[in-house]
Amino acid sequence: MADRLLAIIDPAGAKSFLAYSSIPVDQRGGIGSPRGKYKGWLGSLEPQAEDAGYLTARALIERGKKEKAFGRDGKLHMLAIAGDRSTPSSINRNQGMHRVVAEAPMVVLEEEVYAAWTRENAAQQAESLYRRYSDVKLIWAGNDLMAFGAMAAWEKRGGKPGVDAWFSGINTSTEALEAVKSGRMTALAGGHFITGAWALVMIYDYHHGHDFADEGLELRRPMFAEFTPALADRYIERFSGGFDGVDFSRYSKVRNGKLKRYNFGFAQLLEPQS
């Protein structure tokens, strides 16, 4: 889709910028890189999605160790419910999860399934997987909805999420944040939704004569924050009404002359205010 849009937009002399996801290299054909064939394609910014998978899987496994949620073989047994097999977001989140598993020899990843990002599919698949793998107590999910589906299937068996099985998810829905606060969800990462705001900061700087090219034309940056119950509470308190109170000029190189490198991590927006 992006390649077709560039072919329409660029001849008209309009500038363009891709936020959230660039065009995968293996799908570019003759498109090339920004400011090449399409001069008006300024660049792209995407969240480092692997971090979300890594942070949540790591926290989930650490909680499993703390709770001594070991199977009969003395290992931690985990299921992974991913979104899909093909989108960069899903692939990268899954890679982050797999990296943690590779670093943890006491963890057995029993099976990885794909639930198309939906609560209903995840619940249906989890119900079958729980019967198949009786030692599983850790369930990693590629988003919050699939985590809730897996929780519902666990509760249907008479279990209690956060008590006798532990779940992780990705996103910052109010339901997910409340689940972290209550203890039903053990690990949650999010904050990537604000990529659009960071992209506007970069475009603002470019428009005002400070080209972001000195940091690269296609940026993939850490953005995900790991939410503790305290941070979930702070997020709800601070941002439940929106983000109008955030002074994004602080993150602009034009407006903040001291800034040498863009920092697009979401965690900075959750820091205590003086």
Predicted region positions:
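Hydrophobic alpha-helical
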Residues: 1-14, 97, 108-178
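Conserved acidic residues
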Residues: 42, 137-138, 186
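Hydrophobic alpha-helical segments within soluble ligand-binding/sensing domains
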Residues: 37, 43-75, 122, 172, ...
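Flexible loop/hinge segments that line or gate small-molecule binding clefts
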Residues: 7-51, 74, 176-177
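Hinge/cleft segment of the Venus flytrap/periplasmic-binding protein
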Residues: 76-77, 81-85, 198-274
